[in-house]
Amino acid sequence: MYLLNDKVAHELKKPFGKVYKELPSIEGKVVSIGDVTTKHLLSNGIIPNLSILDFKTKRNIPVNIPHKFKTIFEVENPQGCISDEAIERIKYLSTIHDRDMALIIKGEEDLLTIPVIKYFPEDTSVIYGQPDEGMVLLKITDELKQKIEKLLKDMEER
């Protein structure tokens, strides 16, 4: 399990990609992280390969996503950490070439962008919310994977 600390929290305030109010067209493998982001994609006809959500926004405001996912997985991931269970499930899901899968988080999904970038293949599009700004769209690259490895080394491991 990795625990968030002040140093990494400061780094994570900066988006990993470009921030959009409306996303451009997206091709290839797509992972969405966050309820509002996933809802926006689905309402625009974009079905991610994997959606990671907890049915809340801003920690406690319920979000209704009227979509029936093809396959659903659940894991626990407490606030401020990346649980071993979440890491193992994301690692497994990164090997599946399917669409319309959901990973439902009991706890908080905010930090799970980190293992998604670590385990999903290069050129995967990852979209997550940047609170009060929009959605961040990034393509996984080797350079980004190296940055994530450094962040993980800077986190407290238990």
UniProtKB/Swiss-Prot annotation:
Pfam families: DUF359. GO terms for molecular function: GTP binding; kinase activity. Its EC number is 2.7.1.237. Belongs to the GTP-dependent DPCK family. GTP binds at D35, V36, D54, K56, E109, D132. InterPro entries: GTP-dep_dephospho-CoA_kin. It comes from Methanococcus maripaludis (strain C5 / ATCC BAA-1333). Catalyzes the GTP-dependent phosphorylation of the 3'-hydroxyl group of dephosphocoenzyme A to form coenzyme A (CoA). It is an enzyme of class 2 (transferase). GO terms for biological process: coenzyme A biosynthetic process. It catalyses: 3'-dephospho-CoA + GTP = GDP + CoA + H(+). This is GTP-dependent dephospho-CoA kinase. Keywords: Coenzyme A biosynthesis, GTP-binding, Kinase, Nucleotide-binding, Transferase. PANTHER family: GTP-DEPENDENT DEPHOSPHO-COA KINASE (PTHR40732:SF1), UPF0218 PROTEIN TK1697 (PTHR40732).
